[in-house]
Amino acid sequence: MHSPFLGPASLRPLADALAERGQQTVILDLRPSVVAPPVHQTLVGSFADVTADAALSGPLLLIGHSGAGPLLPAFADTFEEGAAGLIFLDAGLPTPGRSWRDTVPADLYSHLRLVSRDGQLPRWQQWFTPDPLVELVADEQLRAEIADEAPEVPLAFLKEARPDVEWDGPAGYVQLSESYVDDAAAAEALGWPVRRLDAHHLATATDPKPVANAIVELLTEMFTPPASVL
């Protein structure tokens, strides 16, 4: 599951790398669900509709990158038989009933409110100067694909309470960047298996093979045999 602030291009190379390792993968495009409030309700409903239409079978494990992490329990809750497990990929952990605004420094929300226009956030790469994509993604074509896919999300989304859904099943964590040191530590404190890579937040797109290896290692630790990956 890609971040609500990005699109499938941020994960497509990782999906390909996982497929090379024998993991069946599906990437959903969640962008149409994040352009108008209430975003959480629309996101979860759209996820349920798309996965039902896809007629997916077998044990399913959800991987959430970045801002998709806190939503994984709600996505998993839409499956009639539940999800086999969750993997948080350089992502925030679930905070049921709390908003994005509740979990970040006040000055970050204030900055985003200042750069928003007509109630809409700019694309993710325009939140700050300089453009983080220039530093993180050297390949111009890939950088353009990621930039073009980034949606303009309503500022109100940041204040919406996240779905009040808990998760007590198998879970794991892959840390890619320093921004998620605390989340990885919290996951470890919960007893989850954790893998830490010397990478960056968009290594899912720029250097996917080590990320795929880390995920497969987690699957091996969490399941025998591994579940299919969604």
Tell what function each PLM region has.
Residues 1-34:
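Conserved HGGG/HGGXW glycine-rich cap/lid loop of the alpha/beta-hydrolase fold
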Residues 24-61, 77, 101-109:
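Active-site loop/oxyanion-hole signature of alpha/beta-hydrolase fold enzymes
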Residues 121-165:
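Conserved alpha/beta-hydrolase catalytic His-Asp/Glu region
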Residues 63-72:
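Gly/Ala-rich beta-loop-alpha elbow adjacent to hydrolase catalytic centers
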Residues 53, 144, 151-213, 219-223:
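Conserved serine/cysteine hydrolase catalytic core
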Residues 1-5, 65-66, 91, 176:
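Glycine-rich His-Gly loop
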Residues 62-63, 86, 173:
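Conserved alpha/beta-hydrolase fold motif
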Residues 77-120, 155-157, 188, 227-229:
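Flexible "cap/lid" loop of the alpha/beta hydrolase fold
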